[in-house]
Amino acid sequence: MELVIGCDINEYYVQFSYAEEGKEPVMPDLPGVTQVETALCRREGVNQWYEGKEAVKRALAGEGALAEHLFSRMLHADTIRLSDSEYQLTDLCSLFLEHTYTAFIRKVREQLGEEITVRALVLTGRIDPGVHYGKLQEIVKNLPVEDISFQSHEESIFSYLVHQPRRLMGYETQVLDLTSEQLVTYRVEMNHKTRPVVVSIETTETDLYKKKHYASIME
């Protein structure tokens, strides 16, 4: 079976899905694998890493140093200090994605009961592929997938809409994202008076209350 893997990553978690050609995407019910907190914990004294909820659990138990908000930090900084060592954030994001992707593929294979081949992977997020391309290439370098592409949320929304029934194209569309400390609204309009049809996506951000990251032990 050939699959395309979707990987949406943000400040709080990475979320995986898959699709067969010509079929609707599937977000399987695989607790701890389909959606994983973007946190890593390095065990004290050894080069052993945990990710997601296990990372938080180990850090809370005093077994290691916690690195959280990995993806958003990586976009805006180069390094992070854990205990007495400094790490490249692209290296930590690469390690995190390698572990979580491998676990997801293994569980999907078990759930489907057959061998699968990953034909392509699409990574989406609040990113500008043109600006962040170098860092994005670094964080996927260890994934065993040849065809990897990057999309901003705006591009992802557009790609989804153009594959919907034509009758929906005449309406204004709004997508709401509430995964951070902001409510992000994507407002999509299509000008059918032009040829080709011109699509515009307006993004607005509304600040909400300061909410603590559920993986945080830093504050």
Regions found by a protein language model. Give the residues of each.
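A short acidic Gly-Thr/Ser loop motif
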Residues: 6-13, 169-184, 189-191
